[in-house]
Amino acid sequence: MEILRLAQSKKNIISLNMDLERDMQRIDEANQELLLEIQEKENEIQRLEHEITQTGNPAEDEEWEKENYTVMEREQALQELEEETARLERKNETLVHSISELQRKLTRKSQKVIRYEQGDLETTPEESKVKLQQLESSCADQEKELGKIMEDYVFVSQLCEDQALCIKKYQEALKRIEEELETGYLEREVSKVLSMDSERERSTSLNKMDGFISKGALRFSKSIFRSLLFSTLFFIRLLGYLIFHLSFINPDLLVNALPKILSRDVLWKLRCFLFPSLTLETEDMLPH
């Protein structure tokens, strides 16, 4: 009967150990996934910080600092959660060690029981009673240890559930922060695009105004040049007509018109000025 109880206790301990190992493996996998997600979020946050430092203004920087402070608080909570996980892992190692010790004890006890059965024929009833009492006391101790291990297992399971709940809440908080960061980033990108469009429209309007001004100045300079050219050509043609008229049609026009226009003093001065150039030197040409 004692051997059956010991075997059943051993099976229970082995199954509990396997369940505990599976739970701890799931916790480790969840922690690894959470660490990968946190690393990705940190890389995304660093990228957003870099972009915001390049294209941000003081108000946006202040808002980003607040968001960064919130993220740092979340990271600190995650670090505390990781420390709690490490503590649970250490406790799990302790439990595994105690379970292995208990298994070794059970193995030794079972071997003793087998040896007891083998030597049962050679022992006396008093010795058998003493050995049976020893086995009962050892079974009681093992049951106490098993109860303690069960309590530790329940405690670890509760902590694992609490940790899973904390991980879920932290993932929800990270998702909400990521959505807020993406929304802020999109708003900043939209405002930047709108400002770029307004600057482009303003530069286009300024270019159009400059084009209109340059075209107006070019047209004005062309009109002035044309007027000067036409005036010069008109005066040259008028002067040609006057010279032609004086040369071939009415050579005495100035002689007849100047006395009517100018006074005698002016005519005398004009005559003194023009007489040397109009007088022909013919003395050398006349016959002697």
Curated annotation (Swiss-Prot):
Subcellular location: Endoplasmic reticulum membrane; Nucleus membrane
Pfam families: TMCO5
One GO CC term on file: nuclear membrane
Top-level taxon of origin: Eukaryota
TM segment ranges: 227-249
Tissue occurrence: Only detected in testis (at protein level).
Family: Belongs to the TMCO5 family.
Record's protein name: Transmembrane and coiled-coil domain-containing protein 5A
Origin species: Mus musculus (Mouse)
Lineage: Eukaryota, Metazoa, Chordata, Craniata, Vertebrata
Gene: Tmco5a
